[in-house]
């Protein structure tokens, strides 16, 4: 049987997809801006 590929880890999740990770790059800031434009309840992980 194959192993499950999703092995949850909150630190990795935040570092890769968190707010500060998004703010670090221009593309990431564009993502946040788009999510604000859609009035998303959560902007990032």
UniProtKB/Swiss-Prot annotation:
Ribonucleoprotein is among the record's keywords: yes
GO biological process: translation
GO molecular function annotation: structural constituent of ribosome
Taxonomic superkingdom: Bacteria
GO cellular component: ribonucleoprotein complex; ribosome
Region annotation Disordered: where it falls in the sequence: 1-45
Biased composition (Basic residues): 10-27
Alphabetical keyword list: Ribonucleoprotein, Ribosomal protein
Pfam families: Ribosomal_L34
InterPro entries per the UniProt record, alphabetical: Ribosomal_bL34, Ribosomal_bL34_CS
PANTHER family, per database record: LARGE RIBOSOMAL SUBUNIT PROTEIN BL34M, MITOCHONDRIAL RIBOSOMAL PROTEIN 34 FAMILY MEMBER
Similarity field: Belongs to the bacterial ribosomal protein bL34 family.
NCBIfam families, sorted: rpmH_bact
Name of the protein this chain belongs to: Large ribosomal subunit protein bL34
Organism field: Micrococcus luteus (strain ATCC 4698 / DSM 20030 / JCM 1464 / CCM 169 / CCUG 5858 / IAM 1056 / NBRC 3333 / NCIMB 9278 / NCTC 2665 / VKM Ac-2230)
Lineage, highest ranks first: Bacteria, Bacillati, Actinomycetota, Actinomycetes, Micrococcales
């Amino acid at each position: 049987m194959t192993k499950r590929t999703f092995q949850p880890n909150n630190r990795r999740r935040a570092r890769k997809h968190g707010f500060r990770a998004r703010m670090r790059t221009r593309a990431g800031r564009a993502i946040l801006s788009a999510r604000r434009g859609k009035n998303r309840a959560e902007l990032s992980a």
